[in-house]
Amino acid sequence: MASPFPILTERLILRPFRDEDLEAMVAIYGREDVNRYLDWGPRSRDDVREWLGRFNRLTDITPRGDALRLAALLKGSDSLIGDFSVWRTSREHLQGEIGFVVHPDHQGKGYAVEAATVMLRMGFERLGFHRIAGQCDPRNAASASLMERLGMRREAHLLENMLVRGEWVGTLVFAMLATEWQAAEARARA
């Protein structure tokens, strides 16, 4: 099958990560405000370099790899603004999950909706998932709002289900079925 990359949206380019993305990724993942709702704290340059080594291989969901992770760049400037992913959580039940991190300078401009929509499309249309979920810390209103704007429904609010950096935190779970995706796409085309 031919590579689908890069993927172009109205304002973004989505492509696999490259070694030269190191500085831009350190500028994102090295920030406390980016990591405050994640399982880890700010990442060092060495941590990010190690991640990039793994991310560079996550370009399709195959029998050997169960994740697709893409860099989002602004068209025209080629500034890397975020990290978007979709991965398999169950082969048997055709389940997946999406994730996203956007540099704070580029939040609130609709870029995350653009890129995350591509990841849902990849999950449902290219990878054949029946259901795609997304999770976030309940205090992360921006992520919860993004998943709702994507058309994902809130399915659960788990209370104190994770110990993150010494604090018990909950999880909001959102999801969308392939039939819901298809209906939303049909409405968008009408």
Predicted region positions:
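Positions that flank functional sites
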Residues: 44, 139, 162
